[in-house]
Curated annotation (Swiss-Prot):
It comes from Homo sapiens (Human). It is found in: Membrane. This is Protein ABHD13. The active site is at residues 193, 268, 298. The keyword Transmembrane helix applies.
């Protein structure tokens, strides 16, 4: 009994000593923290606010970038072409996502040799909303059109993300390569707004399979757009890891050496037209064209006079040459329409 009491007394004294030592250590540790906060409290508070805002932006970037449900019912109803032969296609990506595509074939003269345009749309709506534009391309350019709904858009499964959209574009190109009725030597990529970033990425990774790219009213990158849209906040100082979606087109364009057409609407109120000019200047292509439309807005540049003429001339120029890289002696060409 006495031994038990002595053991308990020893444990009790040891616990009291440990608690006393821990409290002393805490006081020593708290002192520099209190002094630091007293001297630099304002800076620490600003840093905490900055980190909080960055965290919120990271979490909600998808909400700010992707609008698959605008206009309403875009996820429920996808308009289809009427009176025109077309194929409503579903394919699978490498990660198992089911995508919806619409293929509209040109059926006129020399149709087996017609170029095929893979059409990547912007960040809202679905492929059905692009049919008026696509049908005019069909008539004026005499091409096949393959319209793509990204994951999370229209009848495609999944949720949109940067890496997801890249996987989608790769799956679409792989599918085109399996079609015996499409000329593999005349594959053009077209991308508007967000679709331009997708097209640039796909071209940068598949230069041997792509004949040319055409991008319209697209951006340098998401960080560049954030600095433009949120100019009241020092977004330019945020490191890249703060961005969930980056779409670094200004870097990837350096890998796009195929013929390139940059279409810029100078009345674009969403993406600064200067970004299109900068992408054009960054392009290493020996055959690059910049078509400028002073009255062109972000979504409606295709309605400007001379729009389809510019695309037609570019496509004919690419198709006419057996070696696209030797197509022109001049390094660039700017057209103001």
């Amino acid at each position: 009994m006495e031994k038990s009491w002595m053991l308990w007394n020893f444990v009790e004294r040891w616990l009291i000593a440990l608690a006393s030592w821990s409290w002393a250590l805490c006081r020593i540790s708290l002192l520099p923290l209190i002094v630091t906060f007293h001297l630099y409290g304002g800076i620490i508070l600003l840093l905490l606010i900055f980190i909080s805002i960055a965290g919120i932006l990271y979490k909600f970037q998808d909400v700010l970038l992707y609008f698959p449900e605008q206009p309403s019912s875009s996820r429920l109803y996808v308009p289809m072409p009427t009176g025109i032969p077309h194929e409503n296609i579903f394919i699978r990506t490498k990660d198992g996502i089911r995508l919806n595509l619409i293929l509209i074939r040109y059926t006129g003269d020399n149709s087996p040799y017609s170029p095929t345009i893979i059409y990547f749309h912007g960040n809202a709506g679905n492929i059905g909303h692009r049919l008026p534009n696509a049908l005019l391309m069909l008539v004026n350019l005499k091409v096949n059109l393959l319209l793509v709904d990204y994951r999370g858009y229209g009848k495609s499964e999944g949720e949109a993300s940067e890496e997801g959209l890249y996987l989608d574009s790769e799956a679409v190109l792989d599918y085109v390569m399996t079609r015996p009725d499409l000329d593999k030597t005349k594959i053009f990529l077209f991308g508007r707004s967000l679709g331009g970033a997708v097209a640039i990425h796909l071209a940068s990774e598949n230069s041997h399979r792509i004949s040319a790219i055409m991008v319209e009213n697209t951006f340098l990158s998401i960080p560049h757009m954030a600095s433009t849209l949120f100019s009241f906040f020092p977004m330019r100082y945020l490191p890249l890891w703060c961005y969930k979606n980056k779409f670094l087109s200004y870097r990837k364009i350096s890998q796009c050496r195929m013929p390139s057409l940059f279409i810029s609407g100078l009345s674009d109120q969403l993406i600064p037209p200067v970004m299109m000019k900068q992408l054009y200047e960054l392009s290493p292509s020996r055959t690059k064209r910049l078509a400028i439309f002073p009255d062109g807005t972000h979504n409606d540049t295709w309605q400007c006079q001379g729009y389809f003429t510019a695309l037609e001339q570019f496509i004919k120029e690419v198709v006419k040459s057996h070696s696209p890289e030797e197509m022109a002696k001049t390094s660039s060409n700017v057209t103001i329409i």
